[in-house]
């Protein structure tokens, strides 16, 4: 199977502590804007806003 060129691997970085706690894939064709999700941060032991960053 061919790899889909539109799907990009991204990281979700905690806005409070700065840790990259989650990685996921995003389709740039359908979701052009940056993702912001409320996810659990294990360091702070609470739910915080996680913002999308590029992974190298």
UniProtKB/Swiss-Prot annotation:
The gene is rpmG. One of its GO terms (molecular function) is structural constituent of ribosome. PROSITE patterns: RIBOSOMAL_L33 (PS00582). InterPro entries: Ribosomal_bL33 (IPR001705), Ribosomal_bL33_CS (IPR018264), Ribosomal_bL33_sf (IPR038584), Ribosomal_zn-bd (IPR011332). GO terms for biological process: translation. One of its GO terms (cellular component) is ribosome. NCBIfam families: PRK00504.1, PRK00595.1, rpmG_bact. Keywords: Ribonucleoprotein, Ribosomal protein. This is Large ribosomal subunit protein bL33. SUPFAM superfamilies: Zn-binding ribosomal proteins. It comes from Campylobacter hominis (strain ATCC BAA-381 / DSM 21671 / CCUG 45161 / LMG 19568 / NCTC 13146 / CH001A). Belongs to the bacterial ribosomal protein bL33 family.
